[in-house]
Design a protein with these regions (language model features):
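C-terminal all-alpha effector/ligand-binding and dimerization domain
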Residues: 119-172
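Short, hydrophobic secondary-structure boundary micro-motifs
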Residues: 8-10, 44, 103-107, 145
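Eukaryote-biased recognition of C-terminal alpha-helical segments
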Residues: 111, 116-120
């Protein structure tokens, strides 16, 4: 759904989905609960579901919310803490310092669904981006908002590029 292989608005029943995957309805039902939580499907009456319409603006808002929570997490990090490891490990580390379980769960959903999808699409890893954002933030740099916006736009562009490949369209 996120890649665009299943077009927005596509409707199907749990039974149709289970049959097409060759599995029983129970694992499909469990998977659909996760997809609904991640914002990728919408439940309809009579055990039907519909693929969510993930417009560019919707994706931009989701990534902005994730960035807002990650900036909050950066401020909660101990002053001597560093972000190490690959890009996704750095995202996951930030999630652990958020004080409220709801914020951690929301950020987990954004990170593991949308950010991980974008990061996996990158031709070469960029492992120091969050560490550099943390450094800028700790230095009180006025460039922090612009740096975060650039990072969000990069992730958005990666997602839109993959989606356009499946839709046969160009990204802008």
């Amino acid at each position: 759904i996120l890649s665009g292989q299943i077009p927005a608005g596509t409707e199907m029943t749990q039974n149709e989905l289970a049959e097409s995957l060759g599995v029983s309805r129970m694992p499909v039902r469990e998977a659909l609960m996760i997809l609904e939580y991640q914002g990728l499907i919408i439940r309809l009456p009579n055990n039907r579901i519909k693929a969510a319409d993930l417009t560019e603006e919707t994706l931009r808002q989701i990534l902005a919310l994730g960035a807002q929570l990650e900036r909050q997490a950066m401020r909660a990090l101990p002053q001597d803490a560093m972000l190490a490891g690959g890009e996704m490990l750095q995202h996951r580390t930030l999630r652990t310092v958020l004080p409220y379980p709801l914020h951690r769960k929301l950020l987990e959903s954004i990170q593991e669904t949308y950010i991980a999808f974008a990061v996996s699409a990158r031709p070469t890893p960029v492992n120091d981006r969050l560490a550099r954002l943390l450094m800028l933030d700790r230095q009180g740099s006025p460039d922090v908002p612009d740096a975060w916006n650039a990072y969000e736009e990069e992730l958005l562009h990666l997602i839109l590029t993959i989606r356009s490949q499946y839709a046969g369209t160009e990204t802008h």
